[in-house]
Amino acid sequence: MEEELAMLRQLIGQLQELLHNGSPPPPSSSSSLSSSSPSFLVLHHPQYQNGWCLPCIEDTSADDCCDIVMAGGKRPGIFKMLETVKPPVKRTRKERTQGKSCTEVDEISGNMDQEIWQEFPQDLFEDVVSRLPMATFFQFRAVCRKWNALIDSDSFSRCFTELPQTIPWFYTITHENVNSGQVYDPSLKKWHHPIIPALPKKSIVLPMASAGGLVCFLDIGHRNFYVSNPLTKSFRELPARSFKVWSRVAVGMTLNGNSTSHGYKVLWVGCEGEYEVYDSLSNVWTKRGTIPSNIKLPVLLNFKSQPVAIHSTLYFMLTDPEGILSYDMVSGKWKQFIIPGPPDLSDHTLAACGERLMLVGLLTKNAATCVCIWELQKMTLLWKEVDRMPNIWCLEFYGKHIRMNCLGNKGCLILLSLRSRQMNRLITYNAVTREWTKVPGCTVPRGRKRLWIACGTAFHPSPTARA
């Protein structure tokens, strides 16, 4: 019996030690511990809501202790209320450093930071940084030279390339400010005003296509091509073409792989069927002949509609006959699809969402005008309407002559620029979530807000894309 009493005292001592060190006692959950039992005391007081009781066994026998533990209620026992001990609370840095000198605190913090961060894995660091929002990433680069040099790191470039692509940005030229571009970031709903110093200042240069974070520019005289990353100012002037084309041309761009490190291709095609392909790896234009004879010449392209790229294939919109012209950058094959457009349609352009080919246009009946979205059905080669702008927004266009420009060549986000004599609107449409969002006006430097986009292209922002 003495051994049992000693073990019980040891148990009580351990519990008291736990209480003294700050560990919370287990809550009383047994229904037998009630106020009706003389051997146990349960206090219900605001000050002791978490209080609990232990028997005082200094003056009791082992039998009494066993009776208390095993047969509560048969014999009276003496109890001692222990002071309520709250769970440990995390102290603030000010409380932890209270009473220490500034030198001691700085030494502790410095040693702690050095010990933690000097062993931080570089691959994990790059993996975290690659997931930062683009605007935050460029602020992050200003911290030190090492972080600024990340965009030149091959491992960081691979890490960034493996991430799923985010919603695209839009490089635009406003109607009255054709000498500089404005970039819209839909995630922040903010306009940026990048400067690409290498672009010629004396001629008008327009954005024509994009791939992998790079934007392809063409001067208004159709003489020179340029490729640049608007975020990092990486720039390349493409070599002169093998022959001059003075007519209007359509321009498309694709990647050779999943990033610009594998190279990219640029295609231009003229109305008479002539075309050339530029490969960044060889840095030359290749003349691959003319469009096959089974495709009607002249090629009447809808130049308001930008070509869209799905994998390695470019799609152009035809006006006569109505349909789509495609070119595979890998196989070099042209195809033509006769696809009649929806009736009462105007200002229509192609758009892409993943592997889906979309059509965006103005549908006008009587005096009512609305923006509609169609998707090409691959089995029937017919356009199927999948969405249209909310009616309350369409009412703004009632009785007005509306014109529209559309940028939707990358990602699943489409930027619409709508104007009439009385109004201008900028709107984005998400083809995945089917959300319509109004876009704030673009404030041109030293100018007022502009709500009309003359031309532009969508592109996926990339800090690692190199021209």
Curated annotation (Swiss-Prot):
InterPro entries named in the record: At3g26010-like_b-prop, F-box-like_dom_sf, F-box_dom, Gal_Oxase/kelch_b-propeller, Kelch-typ_b-propeller, SCF_F-box_component
Ranges where the F-box domain occurs: 114-163
Lineage top rank: taxon: Eukaryota
Signal peptide span: none
GO biological process: leaf vascular tissue pattern formation; regulation of auxin mediated signaling pathway; simple leaf morphogenesis
Kelch repeats: 163-211, 252-305, 406-456
Keywords: Kelch repeat, Repeat
Keyword set includes Membrane: no
Record Gene3D superfamilies: 1.20.1280.50, Kelch-type beta propeller (2.120.10.80)
Name of the featured protein: F-box only protein 6
SMART domains: FBOX
Encoding gene (name): FBX6
Species per Swiss-Prot/TrEMBL record: Arabidopsis thaliana (Mouse-ear cress)
